[in-house]
Swiss-Prot record:
Name this polypeptide is given: Rhodotorucin-A peptides type 2
Keyword check for Magnesium: no
Function: Rhodotorucin-A is a mating pheromone in cells of mating type A of Rhodosporidium toruloides.
Gene behind this protein: RHA2
Keywords (A to Z) from UniProt: Cell membrane, Lipoprotein, Membrane, Pheromone, Prenylation
A GO MF label: pheromone activity
Lipid-modified sites (S-farnesyl cysteine): 14, 29, 44, 59, 74
CC annotations in GO: plasma membrane
Domain of life, per lineage: Eukaryota
Site, as annotated: Not methylated: 14, 29, 44, 59, 74
Membrane topology reported for the UniProt record: Lipid-anchor
Residue ranges the record assigns to the propeptide: 1-3, 15-18, 30-33, 45-48, 60-63, 75-77
């Protein structure tokens, strides 16, 4: 399921496990370490990263080819 080998997270609110530069909680994905990615806690609203685009409803990736997940709590595919 995980296309990106350096990023690993669960299906419940996106729990990062392997990527050292990205850190967020399980409640709506709160970024704390990656300076180029910024989003709110309500369904992950990207505001700075041009290559990643998703909606506010559970994180819908639309531009990043190596990362794909559904709107229900971020399911990596």
């Amino acid at each position: 399921m995980v296309a990106y080998p350096e990023i690993s997270w669960t299906r419940n609110g996106c729990t990062v496990a392997k990527y050292p530069e990205i850190s967020w909680t399980r409640n709506g994905c709160t970024v704390s370490k990656y300076p180029e990615i910024s989003w709110t806690r309500n369904g992950c609203t990207v505001s700075k990263y041009p290559e990643i685009s998703w909606t506010r409803n559970g994180c819908t990736v639309s531009k990043y080819p190596e990362i794909s997940w559904t709107r229900n709590g971020c399911t990596v595919a």
